[in-house]
């Protein structure tokens, strides 16, 4: 059964999830297996999959009910959301530090000043990862901790923190996956030239990448350039109103917003080049995207073709994903933008289209599409008010979105052999601690189970899905929502910093052990 929670301010502030939102947000809390089975079936997840006996698995190939033997199980965090220690050991402010300290920008005036205090507690957090059983951990490196001014001198104390973190991971048999930028650009560059409004940031980012890879590349060989370009561009800059994402800059035209997207893509491409030039060992280079995912409301040939069309033509994908993977903007998208389209200089697209070794795909929800007799040839369907949501106004329960997102990289963009990692997948739940001290986040288990079932479908059909990083290892600072939303499989008491594994932690632990959906 679904239990509604009280009305929350319908702040569609989490970027990149352009979905219809209802006035009353709802959460799903299921305490009986019958209810879970019913919703799983409704979501298109075979219930029998959860009890099927696993067969012996070969690398890259799933056995019945299981994942390939080399499937990468992991969890993820981001520097600003967990580290704290914003003024320690030479770190200078990032744009989110400045943004958080402006009245009215975050729930309850919350900041990332302390967050999960991971900076001081990383060793025990790594032990928690080992207890969970993950063999892969995705984290981000804070640019202003390494190069505090955004350019120039390297802060070796900042490097030392990540060096010690990497060593701790390796000592526990956990492979580090480092994201070089997860929204925390140095405030110094915002003050100097407006950060992403200037082309200069691409060169500064590449220089920063070089310094990090030179120092950590002997132990880190999995690099991700930038996380979710849409979020800090489209949501960080706006015309006529303060945007909900740092740097929170008001600009005079929509073209200026699109230009920040182009500069971020350029930074990604130059970052790829810098990583490959600096690494002392062969390395895998990825971009992490949160592209808009579309899926057919009914799986007919006409609707599937409509999904392909929407996937490449809708603005978010046409201005971020398509150029990153093909080296050119989608023509229909640019035509729709008209004078608002980004200005491109000679050689830009060759840099932007650097070949990737891996694509990181952050997937939370999706939109249903059907074929239509209109100029576009498709329509994106609104969701009814009673459609289930996961304690966020944008986070609708659409488990098939994971499968269709993976499939469209192959079918719509022709990247059939590009390995894909699910670099984020998870949900917020309204967790409560029982009198026995348990956190029975059964709705999160439902969510994860249903999405992982669709990961199995993608693998079974031959799509190159290679791993899964659960978001998140622990509750953390959820950007403009502050600490009012909990995405972790580990509860964090922000007063004491105590970590308490939730029921979803135990469930995911068993999934990893048995290498199948349970």
Where are these regions (language model features)?
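N-terminal secretory signal peptides
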Residues: 1-24
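Mature N-terminal, pre-catalytic/accessory segment of carbohydrate-active enzymes
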Residues: 16, 33, 37, 55-69
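N-terminal twin-arginine translocation
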Residues: 22-31, 39-59
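Conserved functional loop/turn residues at catalytic and ligand-binding sites
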Residues: 33, 133, 173
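Active-site region of glycoside hydrolase catalytic domains
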Residues: 59-106, 149-151, 159-518
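Aromatic- and Gly/Pro-rich amphipathic surface segment
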Residues: 93-128
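Catalytic domains of carbohydrate-active enzymes, especially glycoside hydrolases
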Residues: 121-142
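Glycine-rich, proline-tolerant flexible connector loops at the mouths of alpha/beta enzymes
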Residues: 143-154
């Amino acid at each position: 059964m679904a239990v509604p929670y009280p009305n929350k301010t319908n702040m569609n502030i989490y970027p990149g999830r352009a979905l219809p939102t209802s006035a009353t947000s709802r959460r799903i809390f299921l305490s009986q297996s019958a209810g879970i089975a019913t919703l799983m079936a409704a979501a298109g997840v075979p219930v029998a999959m959860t009890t099927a006996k696993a067969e012996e698995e070969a690398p890259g190939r799933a056995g019945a009910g299981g994942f390939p033997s080399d499937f990468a199980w992991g969890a993820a965090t981001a520097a600003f959301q967990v580290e704290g220690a914003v003024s320690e050991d030479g770190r200078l402010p990032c744009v989110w530090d400045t943004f958080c300290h402006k009245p009215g920008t975050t729930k309850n005036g919350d900041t990332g000043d302390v967050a999960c205090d991971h900076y001081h507690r990383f060793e025990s957090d790594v032990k928690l990862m080992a207890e969970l059983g993950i063999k892969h951990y995705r984290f981000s490196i804070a640019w202003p901790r390494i190069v505090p001014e955004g350019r120039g001198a390297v802060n070796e104390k900042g490097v030392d923190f990540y060096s010690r973190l990497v060593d701790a991971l390796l000592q526990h048999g956990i492979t580090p996956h480092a994201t070089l930028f997860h929204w925390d650009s140095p405030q110094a560059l915002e003050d100097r030239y407006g950060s992403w409004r200037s082309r200069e940031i691409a060169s500064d980012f590449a220089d920063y990448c070089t310094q990090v890879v030179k120092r950590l590349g002997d132990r880190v060989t999995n690099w991700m350039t930038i996380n979710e370009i849409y979020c800090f561009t489209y949501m960080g800059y706006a015309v006529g109103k303060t945007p909900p994402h740092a740097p929170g800059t008001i600009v005079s035209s929509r073209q200026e917003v699109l230009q920040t997207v182009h500069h971020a893509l350029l930074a990604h491409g130059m970052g790829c080049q810098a990583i490959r030039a600096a690494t002392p060992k062969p390395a895998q280079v990825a971009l992490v995207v949160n592209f808009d995912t579309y899926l057919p409301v009914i799986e007919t040939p006409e609707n599937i073709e409509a999904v392909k069309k929407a996937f490449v033509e809708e603005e978010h994908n046409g201005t971020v994903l398509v150029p990153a993977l093909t080296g050119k903007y989608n023509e229909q998208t640019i035509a729709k933008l008209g004078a608002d389209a980004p200005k491109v200089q000679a050689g830009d697209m060759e840099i932007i289209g650097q070949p990737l070794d891996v694509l990181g795909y952050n997937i939370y929800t999706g939109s249903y599409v059907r074929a239509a007799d209109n100029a576009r040839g498709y329509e994106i369907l609104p969701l009814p008010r009673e459609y289930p949501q996961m304690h966020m106004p944008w986070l609708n329960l659409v488990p098939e979105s994971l499968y269709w997102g993976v499939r469209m990289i192959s079918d719509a963009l022709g990247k059939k052999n590009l390995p894909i990692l699910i670099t984020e997948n998870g949900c917020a739940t309204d967790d409560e601690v029982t009198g026995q001290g348990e956190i029975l986040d059964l709705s999160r288990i439902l969510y994860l189970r249903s999405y992982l079932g669709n990961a199995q479908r993608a693998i079974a059909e031959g799509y190159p899905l290679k791993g899964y990083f659960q978001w998140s290892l622990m509750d953390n600072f959820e950007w403009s929502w502050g600490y009012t939303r909990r995405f972790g499989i580990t509860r964090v008491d922000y007063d004491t910093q105590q970590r308490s594994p939730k029921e979803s932690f135990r469930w995911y632990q068993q999934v990893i052990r048995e290498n199948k959906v349970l």
